[in-house]
Curated annotation (Swiss-Prot):
The lineage of its organism: Bacteria, Bacillati, Bacillota, Bacilli, Lactobacillales. The keyword Cytoplasm applies. It holds the Pfam family Mur_ligase_C. The gene is murC. It catalyses: UDP-N-acetyl-alpha-D-muramate + L-alanine + ATP = UDP-N-acetyl-alpha-D-muramoyl-L-alanine + ADP + phosphate + H(+). It comes from Streptococcus equi subsp. equi (strain 4047). ATP binds at residues 110-116. Gene3D superfamilies: Mur ligase, C-terminal domain (3.90.190.20), Mur-like, catalytic domain (3.40.1190.10), NAD(P)-binding Rossmann-like Domain (3.40.50.720). Cell wall formation. This is UDP-N-acetylmuramate--L-alanine ligase. One of its GO terms (molecular function) is UDP-N-acetylmuramate-L-alanine ligase activity. Belongs to the MurCDEF family.
């Protein structure tokens, strides 16, 4: 039976994906959020889903309410109204934990690589059988006859604890979200608790020291590049067209694969997907066929060309992700100068990982930095500035403003890699406008 869902904070990446999924399943869906444009809203608008400003008037007792995790009684009028009138609502992760029980569920967790791996797993599986999925780039799909459900499993504030998937991949464990986690041990404990809830099989990166300590009642399969792993990627060839490799399990090759993606991390992501689908009983020839057609996910190594200038947009906001993104850029463009334009995201993360950020950015040929993008959850106490990061980077590093990105023009034969989880796309847009204006003036 069709229901009406109202999403409080519908532009969030998980919330927008879930809204799209429920809409495609035939339910009536609407939501509210701030006016500021966010990249997820285009999909909502194309689907005809109404996006309203926050207001008590949006809510009626016959609706099922789903509230974004950031919204509370003290900062959101709709949550306050629901609590005042004793109208029940669920948080995104609470709803998802219940929703997935009707499917064979496949989760993807990890500090880095969740979205790309979820996207890859969803892409391959949906071409073999009816599959619903939620991807952290705001993409959601609800297949009416789906038996399988692929979803991204987020560790922040332990939001993945309501989830009990049949299968799960964990890509890695790393210290992040220092506003919540106290250290690496705390992060490990969260993932270990999640692992204990996986029912049929767990797939983890074998060269991650923390993941080697994970325990679960489900069988654990390690994937990676080492012969000690259960699923081993070998005979690897990385070219400007992507990556080719074979995978073996228990000493026997199970297939030869190509992914049109770049960087060592994407070979690992693909190997995790292959391992999961092999254990779940899918045909490896079909898996190989559908891996070839994967076109990526939003804001993960998204490329465009403006007047012969190559621009890459990526969500990378942690040192490990920066290294992976720059490695991918070098693979695809080995003869070009790699220019990193990075905006640190949150003061707490910048303070905690300042030296690691500097080390990661040294993988570029030149570095430009945007002022730190603070989270709504924190206050700038003046403890760190982007200039502190610039001083630690060994490569040439400059701080730029969104109003003046002209220093980026000082490079020939370059690839520009914009990275960040804040509003780095504003800087990207300024650069694109600058390039367009230069072309007009030269005509």
């Amino acid at each position: 039976m069709s229901k009406t869902y109202h999403f409080i904070g519908i532009k969030g990446s998980g919330m927008s994906a879930l809204a799209l999924l429920l809409h495609q399943m035939g339910h009536k869906v609407q939501g509210s959020d701030v006016e500021k444009y966010y990249f997820t809203q285009r999909g909502l608008e194309q689907a005809g889903i109404t996006i309203l400003p926050f207001s008590e008037d949006n809510i009626s007792p016959d609706m099922e309410l789903i509230a974004g995790n950031a919204f509370r009684e003290d900062n959101n009028s709709e949550v306050a109204y629901a609590m005042r009138h004793q109208l029940p609502f669920k948080r995104y992760h609470e709803f998802l934990g219940e929703f997935m029980k009707q499917f064979t569920s496949l989760g993807v967790a990890g500090a880095h690589g969740k979205t790309s791996t979820t996207g890859l797993l969803s892409h391959v599986l949906k071409h073999m059988t009816a599959t619903s999925y939620l991807i952290g780039d705001g993409t959601g799909h609800g297949a009416a006859d789906a038996r399988y459900f692929v979803f991204e499993s987020d560790e922040y504030e332990r939001h993945f604890m309501p989830y009990h998937p049949e299968y799960s991949i964990i890509t890695n464990i790393d210290f992040d979200h220092p506003d919540y986690f106290t250290g690496l041990d705390d992060v490990f404990n969260a993932f270990n608790d999640y692992a204990k809830q996986v029912k049929k099989a767990l797939f983890v990166y074998g060269e991650d020291e923390e993941l080697r300590k994970i325990s679960s009642p489900a069988p654990i399969y390690y994937y990676g590049f080492e012969d000690t792993d259960d699923f081993v990627a070998f005979d690897i060839t990385r070219t400007t067209n992507g990556s080719d490799f074979k995978v073996k399990h228990k000493g026997h090759a199970i297939g030869q694969f190509h992914v049109p993606a770049y960087g060592r991390h994407n070979i690992l992501n693909a190997t995790a997907v292959i391992a999961n689908l092999f254990i779940a009983g899918f045909d490896m020839k079909l898996v190989a066929e559908h891996l070839k057609s994967f076109s990526g996910v939003k804001r993960r190594f998204t490329e465009k060309v403006i007047n012969d200038t190559i621009i890459i947009d990526d969500f990378a906001h942690h040192p490990t992700e920066i290294i992976a993104t720059l490695d991918a850029a070098r693979q695809k463009y080995p003869n070009k100068e790699i220019i990193a334009i990075f905006q640190p995201h949150t003061f707490t993360r910048t303070i905690a990982l300042l030296d690691d950020f500097a080390h990661a950015l040294n993988e570029a040929d030149s570095v430009y930095l945007a002022p730190i993008y603070g989270s709504a959850r924190e206050v700038d106490k003046g403890d760190v500035k982007v200039e502190d990061l610039a001083a630690r980077v060994e490569r040439p590093a400059k701080v730029i403003s969104v109003d003046n990105v002209s220093p980026l023009l000082d490079h020939d034969n370059a690839v520009y890699v914009f990275m960040g989880a804040g509003d780095i796309q504003l800087y990207e847009r300024s650069f694109e406008e600058l390039l367009a204006n230069l072309t007009k003036n030269n005509q």
